[in-house]
Amino acid sequence: MSAAFLGNVVEKDIHKSSLIASITFALGMAGTGFFIYYGGQHKGSLLSLIGIYICYGFIMGIGLGTGYLSPVKTLMLWFQDKKGLATGLAVAGFGAAKAIASPIMQWLLGDNQNGEIYKMFFILAVVYFIMMFAGHILLAKPADWHEPSGDEKKPGIMEVLKTKPLTNYIGIWVMFYLNITCGLALISQEKMIVKCIGLAGSVGIISTVSAIFNAGGRLGFSAWADKMKDRNTIYKLIFILSIAFTAIVMLTGGIKNAEGNILLIIFVLALIFMVNAGYGGGFSNVPTLLSDHYGMGSISAIHGITLSAWAFAGLTGNQVASRVD
């Protein structure tokens, strides 16, 4: 939700927002490590639990949302003829992180029986801060882009949204919400599904491949959308493909009957990879779709509000999946 509340900060000053993101993300990571350590020294400590929630959930959340928004508009300004490709590159890293960071975290954890998990958070806090601060220093808008000065009246978000029928924006928000909810519903059950089809020993490999599809979907679908007259078409394509793959698996009883059946295993894996790609593609196409409708003037703020759909989907997607047999 931090993206929804801090979109205006990103809009006004990307250097300030990227610095806020760097500091809060690293601080939240280090704070989480500290409270894990504190909890190890004081068994059953409520303070430790509260501290972890605040650091990992709230402080890191501010860094995550603000950092996610900061480079998007800038890249669209630099590559206005290839906005989809530009935003795809920006958010592909978000999807690829699972493939890159997971094995590194596993290596840092090592034998976690010694109760030194907190060290991983301290190390990651330093690494992430260095990388994010480097990005903060390099981030810059094109010299020919004019941002309204303090003396110039800039329309508010609602004024911008009202330039089109409000149902237009509501439709985009709902479409994005459904895309993310359905994606999270399957992705949250990914490991269990892989085990059900008899590939328990390959969970890590499949998880890495699905992360690559996630990142590839962010890049591929957004770049593809650059060639389309209407970016809504890419969402229709994602939904049709996702429904088709789901229908094939459901009609063949793939998940329940796949163990030992190579064809059904392929169907199930194809579904997992397709949903990951569509989930990523949904993310990368939102900012460019919004810019096509509402222009670039307040895109960071509007994009931030739209990402509230991601927050709500995070609350409901896993709940939906847990209630489906």
Positions of the model-derived regions?
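Helix-to-loop junctions at the C-terminal end of transmembrane segments
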Residues: 2-14, 218-230, 325
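Structural signature of the two symmetry-related core transmembrane helices
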Residues: 16-31, 233-249
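Hydrophobic core of transmembrane alpha-helices in multi-pass small-molecule transporters
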Residues: 28, 43-66, 177, 263-281
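Intracellular juxtamembrane helix-capping segments at the cytosolic ends
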Residues: 65-79, 86-87, 280-294
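A late C-terminal transmembrane helix in Major Facilitator Superfamily
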Residues: 89, 98, 279, 291-325
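Helix-loop-helix hairpin linking two adjacent transmembrane segments in secondary transporters
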Residues: 94-143
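Extracytoplasmic gate region of multi-pass secondary transporters
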Residues: 102, 165-223, 283, 287-290, ...
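Flexible cytoplasmic inter-helical loops of multi-pass small-molecule transporters
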Residues: 140-158
